[in-house]
Amino acid sequence: MTISPPERGEKAKGGVPTPYDQPVDRGNAPVDFEKLNKPGFWSSKLSKGPKTTTWIWNLHADAHDFDTHLGDLEETSRKIFSAHFGHLAVVFIWMSAAFFHGARFSNYTGWLADPTNVKPGAQVVWPVVGQEILNADLGGNYHGLQITSGIFQMWRAWGITSEVQLMALAIGAVVMAALMLHGGIYHYHKAAPKLEWFQKIEPMIQHHQIALIGLGSIAWAGHLIHIGAPVSALLDAIDAGNPLVVDGVSIASASDVTNLAPKLCDPAIASQIFPSLAGRTVENFFTLNWWAFTDILTNKGGLNPVTGSLWMTDISHHHLAFGVFAIFGGHMWRNAVHGVGHSMKEIMDVHKGDPILFPAPKGHEGIFDFLSNSWHGQLSINLAMVGSASIVVAHHMYALPPYPYIAIDYPTVLGLFTHHMWIGGLFICGAAAHAGIAMIRDYDPAIHVDNVLDRMLKARDAIISHLNWVCMWLGFHSFGLYIHNDVMRALGRPQDMFSDTGIQLQPFLAQWVQNLQQSAVGTGQLVGAGNLPGNVLSEVFNGNVIEVGGKVAIGPIPLGTADLMIHHVHAFTIHVTLLILLKGVLYSRSSRLIPDKAQLGFRFPCDGPGRGGTCQVSSWDHVFLGLFWMYNSLSVVIFHFSWKMQSDVWGLTGGNFAQSSITINGWLRDFLWAQSSQVLTSYGQPISMYGLMFLGAHFVWAFSLMFLFSGRGYWQELFESIVWAHNKLKVAPTIQPRALSITQGRAVGVAHFLLGGIATTWAFFHARLIGLG
C-alpha cells in the first residue's frame, strides 16, 4: 500500500515558488500575549479547556509538535529557528551561573595554588536545617561541596587566574543571554526568514563550517596562543617549583600571574615566555616562515608531566589546524555569490553506489530533496552524528586528558565519562525517533523508487532477521561464558574457567593494535616521513605510568580474557539496541501485521478493536523499548570503565578486575556490593547526600515499575471505583479522572526508569570515589 505524507502548507507543496528577492518577511507576527493565557491555543480541541484529566497529558505531549500545530513548513521552521535563540539564552544563563558561583562562593584560587592537595569546591551549604555536615574539608582552609564537573581544570586551561575574571565572564554571559533572547524575538516577530532561506543548504553549510566552526576554532586558537598557553606555562612553572622570571620579576603565585595577565598581549612581555610572540608574527606568517612558531604551535604529544594533561601548545596547534581545514572544506560548496564549487544535490543525484553489494539503480536520487524538506530527517542524522561524537569524546577524555590536573581527579574522570556516554546514548535514541517521524510525515514512496532509501526498505526483512541472529548469537555466547565460569568456580574447578590463568580467551586483535601503536614509535610508521617521538602516543598504549601529586594520572591499560568477555556483552547490548531502533524506523510506515501503519501516525497504542496483537508496534514504542536497551548497554559500559580504571590504572582495588569480573557472582560481590559500601555507610559524613540520593533514586526507579507493569484497564477500574465513592459523598470533581493512555503511561514509566537508574548510578560512583578521597 502506498501512503503519501500529509500536505504541509502552501510552501511545502512544490508549486510555483514566490520570488526570492528578500530572505525575510518583515513584521511577520506581532507579539500576542493574549493567546498565551489560553493553554493549548495551538489546538482547537485543547484550547477548549479540560473535560478530563487526559487534557493535561496531551498538553505536555503536543506542546512542541509544531508540525501538527501549523501544517506549514515555513512557519514551523521559523518557530524552531527562534527557539534556537531561546535555547542559547538558557545556555548563557547557565554558564553565567557557573561563573558567578566560581567568582563568589568557590575556592578556585585556593585550588589553583595547590591543585594536587586542594579539592574543587563550588559553594558552601548554608545551615538552614542543620545540613552543614555536607561541607567537607576540601583543603586550603575551605569547607564546602566538592564538585566533579572538571570546571576548575577547564578554567585553568583557559587562563583564568582570579575571581574578578570569573565575575567579568558571568556578566558577559548574562549580556549574551539578553542578546540571544532579543535575537529570538527579532527573527520571529520582526524579520522572519522565508522557507527558501532555510532550504539553501550550501550557504548554510558554508556559514556553519567556515564562520562558526572554522573561524571560531581559529579565534579560540588565538586565545590559547596569547592567553591560555602563556598563563599555563607560568602556572606549570610555579607548580613544578621553578617559577619563571618575566621582566625581572619572579612569577611565584597565581596572583602574580593575574597581575601580569593584562601585559601578555605586549610582544615584549609575551616573548619572554614564548619567543615566537616577539612581534614579527604577521611578517613570519605571510613570508611563510612558519618554523618561527614551533614553540607556541607544537606537536610534542603525550602528557605534560607536571599537570598530567595534554600540552597547551599542542591544543593550540590542533585548534588552528582544525579551523584551517574547516575553512577549506567549507569553500568546497557552490553558493549564490559565486558559481564555483560543488552542488550537494548534483553530487547526491549522481552517486549510485555499488551495483553488486547494494543494487539501487537510482542511487541517492531524491535524498537531497527529502532532507531539504524534512527537518526531522536532518535532525535524525545530526543527532546520530553528535551522539556518536559524544561517545568518542567520553573515551578520549581519560586517554588524552585535555585539562590540567583533571586526570588525578578520579570522581571527575568517571563522572565525565559517564556523562558523555549517557548524552551519546540519548541522542542516538533521539535519532531513531526523528527518523521514524520523518518516514511517517515527510517520506513519499512515489518519489523514492529504486534509490538507496527504497532499497533499505525493500531489504528490511533481511536486515532485521540478520540482526536478530547476531543478537541471539552474541547473547547466548557472551552470557554462556559467564555462566560457565560461575558453574566452574562454584564447583571448585578454576583450571576449567575462561580466564588468564585457565582457558585463555585473549583479545589478540586489540592487543595487536596496542602493540602496533607502541612499536611504531621512532619508525615514522604513523606519520609518514618524519620519525614519531616516543611521547606522541597515549600512555594507554603500553606506555609509561604518569604520576602527578602521588596519584596515577594515566598508565598502560592491559587487556585480557575478562576484557574480551565483557566486550562481547557490549556487542550484544549495542546490537539489540540497534535492532529495536532500526526496526522502528524501517517498519514505521507499514508491516505485514499493520499495512496502513503510516496513517496511524508516529505514536499510537493499538490498531483499534478486533485486531489483537497490534498494540505497542508504533515507531514511538520502538524508541520506548530502545531506551531501555540503551540504558542496559551504557550501564555495562560505565560499570566496566569504573571497575577497570580502579583496578588496573588507579590502583584502588588491587588489580582484581581480571579474576573477579569473569563471573556474574564477581560482578555482584566485588563490584556492586563491595564498592557500594561508601554510599551505604555515608550517613554522618559529607557524602551523606549521596546516600540519600541513592535511596531516593531507587524509589524513583521502583516508582516507574508501577507504570510499566500495570495495564491501563487496571487503573481505569480503580479510578471509577474512587469516583463512585466521591459521587456518593457528592464531592465529585468537574474534570473527569481518566487513567493515563497506554502511550502516556509508558512515557511516564520510561522517564522515571531512566531518571532513577541514572541518579542511582551517579550517587554510587561519586560516593565511592569521593569517599575514598
UniProtKB/Swiss-Prot annotation:
GO biological process: photosynthesis
EC number: 1.97.1.12
Top EC class for this record: oxidoreductase
Record localization: Cellular thylakoid membrane
Bilayer topology annotation: Multi-pass membrane protein
Gene Ontology MF, one: magnesium ion binding
Span of the signal peptide: none
Transmembrane segments: 80-103, 166-189, 205-229, 315-333, 375-398, 414-440, 462-484, 564-582, 622-643, 687-709, 747-767
Catalytic activity line of the entry: reduced [plastocyanin] + hnu + oxidized [2Fe-2S]-[ferredoxin] = oxidized [plastocyanin] + reduced [2Fe-2S]-[ferredoxin]
Co-factor remark: PSI electron transfer chain: 5 divinyl chlorophyll a, 1 divinyl chlorophyll a', 2 phylloquinones and 3 4Fe-4S clusters. PSI core antenna: 90 divinyl chlorophyll a, 22 carotenoids, 3 phospholipids and 1 galactolipid. P700 is a divinyl chlorophyll a/divinyl chlorophyll a' dimer, A0 is one or more divinyl chlorophyll a, A1 is one or both phylloquinones and FX is a shared 4Fe-4S iron-sulfur center.
CC annotations in GO: photosystem I; plasma membrane-derived thylakoid membrane
Amino acids binding [4Fe-4S] cluster: 606, 615
Pfam families listed in its UniProt record: PsaA_PsaB
HAMAP family documented for this protein: PSI_PsaA
Described function: PsaA and PsaB bind P700, the primary electron donor of photosystem I (PSI), as well as the electron acceptors A0, A1 and FX. PSI is a plastocyanin/cytochrome c6-ferredoxin oxidoreductase, converting photonic excitation into a charge separation, which transfers an electron from the donor P700 chlorophyll pair to the spectroscopically characterized acceptors A0, A1, FX, FA and FB in turn. Oxidized P700 is reduced on the lumenal side of the thylakoid membrane by plastocyanin or cytochrome c6.
Family to which this protein belongs: Belongs to the PsaA/PsaB family.
Quaternary structure note: The PsaA/B heterodimer binds the P700 divinyl chlorophyll special pair and subsequent electron acceptors. PSI consists of a core antenna complex that captures photons, and an electron transfer chain that converts photonic excitation into a charge separation. The cyanobacterial PSI reaction center is composed of one copy each of PsaA,B,C,D,E,F,I,J,K,L,M and X, and forms trimeric complexes.
Name this polypeptide is given: Photosystem I P700 chlorophyll a apoprotein A1
